[in-house]
Amino acid sequence: MLKLRQLQKEKQRQAAQAQAPAQGRSAASPAQLRVEKDLATLELPTTVTLDTKCLGSENKVYLRISPEEGVYRGGHFRFSVVFRDTYPIEPPTVKCLNTIYHPNIDYSGNICLNVLREDWSPVMDLQTVVLGLLFLFLEPNGSDPLNRQAADTMLRDPYRFETNVQATMMGGHLDGQVFDNVRH
C-alpha cells in the first residue's frame, strides 16, 4: 500500500511539473489572435510595407506608405498601428509619425478617417485600415478636416495646395510649421 501511494505522489509531481511551463506562458488574448489572423490574410500593395518587430512586446506594427500617384507621390509616410486589448471591437490607434501637410492629418499625427472612428466595425481588419490610409493620400478629404488650413487651401486653390504639399514633403517651413522631409 505504501508503494502505491509513493507511485501516486510521483505521478502527481510529474504532472504538476509538466503543467508548470504551460502555466508560466501567457495565453494569447483574443485581440492578439485576431491580429495574427489579420496579418496572415493581409495583402499589401507594392506601395505599402509592414514592420512587425514590435508586435509581440507592444502590440504595435509600423506601416510605410509610398504613394505612386496623386499629390503625395514620391513621399514615404510612416504610421504606427497599436492594437489595444479591445481590438477588433474597437479600432486600432493609428498615428502618422511624420509631420506632414494634409487636410486629414494634423501636425501631431492624428488621423481623420471614418473607419478609425464611427464607421469602425469588428468585421473590419488591418486590410481595411491600410486601404483607408492609401485612399487618404489619393483623395484627401477637405470636407472633414483635422488640418483646416490645408483643407481650405485645397478647396479654394488646388494648385497652391499641390505646391504646398510638394514643398513641405521636402521638409522646411510653411506658415510657421516645420515639416519632415518624406522624400528620402
Swiss-Prot record:
The UniProt entry annotates the active site at: 112 (glycyl thioester intermediate)
* GO terms for biological process, alphabetical: protein neddylation
Under the heading SMART domains, the entry gives: UBCc
An annotated Gene Ontology molecular function = NEDD8 transferase activity
Catalysis: reaction(s)? [E1 NEDD8-activating enzyme]-S-[NEDD8 protein]-yl-L-cysteine + [E2 NEDD8-conjugating enzyme]-L-cysteine = [E1 NEDD8-activating enzyme]-L-cysteine + [E2 NEDD8-conjugating enzyme]-S-[NEDD8-protein]-yl-L-cysteine
Query: Which organism does this sequence originate in?
Result: Eremothecium gossypii (strain ATCC 10895 / CBS 109.51 / FGSC 9923 / NRRL Y-1056) (Yeast)
Pfam families assigned:
UQ_con
Residue span(s) of domain UBC core = 30-174
InterPro entries, per database record: UBQ-conjugat_E2_core, UBQ-conjugating_AS, UBQ-conjugating_enzyme/RWD
The protein's annotated pathway: Protein modification; protein neddylation
Sorted UniProt keywords: ATP-binding, Nucleotide-binding, Transferase, Ubl conjugation pathway
Give the function comment from the record: Accepts the ubiquitin-like protein NEDD8/RUB1 from the UBA3-ULA1 E1 complex and catalyzes its covalent attachment to other proteins.
Q: Where is the composition biased (Low complexity)?
A: 14-29
Q: Which family does it belong to?
A: Belongs to the ubiquitin-conjugating enzyme family. UBC12 subfamily.
- What this protein is called in its record is NEDD8-conjugating enzyme UBC12
Q: Name one GO cellular component term.
A: nucleus
Keyword ATP-binding applies: yes
